[in-house]
């Protein structure tokens, strides 16, 4: 818009055209937010050759990430046309990588309008909103505080000589108990 105004062009009147990020996205992962967590997720997806598109509202981050070869687009993930352009309805998974509950719930609502079957994974600081998110249609909630605790205890047990298989089994058992100890 700024470039158009600088050239003396007038912004178009009426509704802006819907974004079109890519025409061949299917069975991909949509990453909502491309900060530290979103970038880490993308790095692992890329290493496994799993297609993804990331969406972020920071134009500098988007530009720099695109220059580095990342499939990142500018857009507010609470806007239906942005998620539609990212082909949420054809994706295998939507990841909400920011830990803001209200914003996450808005995104979940829009995703569910576009697809009632796509899996949704949400990052949260803790499990405070676990039931609300699950009831809204979230497939999995990842509470940072518990995951950090599980990682720490894994290292403690490993350094204390506990076999890796037993550590993995115990950690999985704790996750299966659905994070109830954090209240």
Language model segments and positions:
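Cytosolic regulatory regions of ion transport systems
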Residues: 1-183
């Amino acid at each position: 818009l700024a470039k158009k105004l600088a050239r003396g062009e007038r912004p178009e009147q009426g509704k802006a055209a819907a974004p079109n990020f890519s025409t061949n996205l299917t069975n991909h992962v949509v990453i909502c937010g491309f900060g530290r967590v979103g970038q880490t997720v993308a790095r692992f997806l890329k290493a496994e050759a799993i297609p993804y598109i990331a969406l972020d509202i920071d134009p500098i981050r988007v530009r720099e990430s695109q220059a580095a070869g990342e499939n990142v687009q500018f857009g507010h993930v609470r806007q239906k046309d942005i998620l539609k352009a990212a082909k949420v309805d054809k994706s295998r998974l939507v990841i909400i990588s920011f830990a803001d509950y209200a914003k996450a719930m808005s995104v979940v609502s829009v995703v569910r309008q576009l697809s009632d079957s796509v899996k949704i994974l949400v990052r949260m600081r803790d499990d405070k909103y676990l039931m609300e998110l699950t009831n809204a249609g979230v497939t999995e909630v990842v509470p940072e505080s518990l995951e950090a605790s599980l990682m720490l205890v894994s290292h403690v047990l490993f350094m204390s000589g506990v076999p890796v298989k037993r550590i993995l089994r115990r950690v999985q058992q704790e996750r299966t108990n659905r994070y109830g100890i954090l209240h």
